Every structure is written in structure tokens, then in C-alpha cells.
């Protein structure tokens, strides 16, 4: 989770919502990393999507069987669908997302028995730290009066 938080901090520094994600293989080696990059003009550039794509390139296969996704915020429906399609084995996320979370909050796509793949889910891991990171980002965003992009770490 430390690497996911570091990526989330990087996202915030770039003016993105602070979400970071990593994909680790069976041995715990990180094979994919991602941070939000939507403000670069790509609505699909969620941290999870980028980490999945990098992991698939790293192993040369779209099937990420035996891997674990660690992300600072509960994935949305799009990212949850990508996790299912990539056959990720386990999902660990920080804060629950009451507005878009689709791994237990608004729905549970990653454990839907109608789908061809389901995964183990651990939600609320380091939840307070995840929530505080997001709250700090949005507080600073609201405080900006001159339009300058600013992020103050930790």
C-alpha cells in the first residue's frame, strides 16, 4: 500500500484526484503501477486501468491470474470490470467510495456470481489514511482562489 500512496501523492501534485494503484504478482513484486491521469485528457486514465495495462505488458499476457491489485480508493464500475476481465485474483482497497465505488458500496461487480470471474476483496485497508488524503486534496482545491495548481504533501 505504501507504493499506492506514493502514486496517489504524485497524482495530487499533478492536480489529479489522489488515487494510486499497483498490481503485484504472486511473489509480491510490483508489476504494474498507475496514478490518476484523467486531467491529461483521457477519461479512461484511472489509476487502476493504468496499473492493469502496465502489468499486462510486463508479463506479456492480459490474464493477470494470481495477482493482487492494491489501490487507495474503492474502484468504480469501469475499473471493477477491468479487474474482472483481467482475472485479478485479489483486490485490496483503502477508502470506500460512496459516490462511485463498485466493489461493495454501490454494487459489487468483482464478486458477482453471474460473471465468469470473481475475486477476493479486502476493503477499508488503511481506510483513514486514504480518506484523509482525499479530503486534504479537496479542501485545498476549494481553498484555491487564484487558480494556481498546488498540492502540499502530507
Question: What does each model-found stretch correspond to?
Answer:
Residues 19-28:
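Short beta-strand scaffold segments in enzyme catalytic cores
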Residues 15-19, 65:
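Short, basic and Ser/Thr-rich N-terminal targeting/leader segments
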Residues 40-50:
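A short, polar/charged loop-to-alpha-helix boundary motif
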Residues 1-11, 78, 82-154:
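Zinc-dependent deaminase
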Residues 61-74:
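Immediate flanking context of iron-sulfur cluster ligation sites
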Amino acid at each position: 500500500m505504501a507504493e499506492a500512496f506514493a502514486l496517489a501523492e504524485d497524482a495530487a501534485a499533478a492536480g489529479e484526484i489522489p488515487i494510486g494503484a499497483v498490481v503485484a504478482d504472486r511473489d509480491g513484486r510490483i508489476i504494474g503501477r498507475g496514478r490518476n491521469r484523467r486531467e491529461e485528457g483521457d477519461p479512461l486514465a484511472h489509476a487502476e486501468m493504468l496499473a492493469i495495462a502496465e502489468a499486462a505488458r510486463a508479463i506479456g499476457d492480459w490474464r493477470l491470474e494470481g495477482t493482487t491489485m492494491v489501490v487507495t480508493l474503492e474502484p468504480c464500475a469501469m475499473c471493477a470490470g477491468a479487474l474482472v476481465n483481467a482475472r485479478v485474483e485479489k483486490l485490496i482497497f483503502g477508502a470506500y467510495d460512496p459516490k462511485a465505488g463498485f466493489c461493495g458500496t454501490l454494487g459489487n461487480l468483482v464478486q458477482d456470481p453471474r460473471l465468469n470471474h470473481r475475486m477476493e476483496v479486502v476493503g477499508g485497508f488503511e481506510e483513514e489514511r486514504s480518506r484523509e488524503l482525499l479530503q486534504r486534496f479537496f479542501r485545498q482545491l476549494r481553498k484555491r482562489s487564484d487558480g494556481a495548481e498546488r498540492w502540499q504533501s502530507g
